């Protein structure tokens, strides 16, 4: 399923994002002078299952989770520098059931262990001066079946 997600908005997913699903967020531009840009994967109860906060000013990409109205957990960080290489950056999230695998421009950055065991029902995108286009495209599908033996 393909969606268009505008900055400072969210999309409700037609089907839950759950184990064995892949979400790819693609931008038509990369604004290297952009500021903090955030993507949140939210449950139907508005818990933030996966928070991806791209912070160029801190040279960090922060991952976290929290229940609606609850406190943030401990941050997990990776360096920002060099994560987005092309003019059309992408973020891919694979749901492995017990953890998320997050890739930037098709390179794995982190495996983030799920802290809240729910499915995502929405994805939010926020920024004051986004690194990415508005809208971005969000493509959600299941994992491809294994290839037959050669």
UniProtKB/Swiss-Prot annotation:
Main localization of the protein? Answer: secreted
What name goes with this protein?
A: Galectin-1
InterPro entries reported in the protein's UniProt record? ConA-like_dom_sf, Galectin_CRD
Tissues expressing this chain: Most abundant in fruiting bodies. Very low levels of expression in asexual vegetative mycelia.
Tell me the subunit arrangement.
Homotetramer. Oligomerization is required for carbohydrate binding.
Molecular-function annotations in GO:
lactose binding
- Biological role: Binds lactose. May play a role in fruiting body formation.
Q: Which GO terms describe its biological process?
A: sporocarp development
Residues annotated to bind a carbohydrate = 51, 55, 64, 75
Q: Where in the cell is it found?
A: Secreted, Extracellular space, Extracellular matrix; Secreted, Cell wall; Endomembrane system
The record's GO CC annotations read:
cytoplasmic vesicle; endomembrane system; extracellular matrix; extracellular region; fungal-type cell wall; membrane
Induction per UniProt is: Repressed by continuous light.
**Gene3D superfamilies, alphabetized:** 2.60.120.200
Where do the Galectin domain residues begin and end?
A: 9-141
Pfam families recorded: Gal-bind_lectin (PF00337)
Q: Which domain of life is it from?
A: Eukaryota
State the UniProt keywords alphabetically. Answer: Cell wall, Extracellular matrix, Fruiting body, Lectin, Membrane, Secreted
């Amino acid at each position: 399923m393909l969606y268009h997600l505008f900055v400072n908005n969210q999309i409700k997913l037609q089907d839950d994002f759950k184990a064995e699903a892949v979400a790819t967020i693609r931008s038509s531009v990369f604004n290297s002078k952009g500021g903090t840009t955030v993507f949140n994967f939210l449950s139907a109860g508005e818990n933030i299952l996966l928070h991806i906060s791209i912070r160029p000013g801190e040279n960090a990409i922060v991952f976290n989770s929290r229940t609606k109205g609850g406190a943030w957990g401990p941050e997990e960080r990776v360096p920002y520098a060099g994560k987005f290489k092309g003019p059309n950056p992408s973020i891919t999230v694979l749901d492995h059931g017990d953890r998320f695998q997050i890739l930037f421009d098709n390179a794995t950055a982190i495996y983030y262990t799920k802290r809240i065991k729910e499915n995502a029902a929405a994805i939010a995108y926020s920024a004051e001066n986004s690194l990415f286009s508005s809208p971005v495209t969000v493509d959600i599908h299941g994992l491809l079946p294994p290839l037959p033996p050669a």
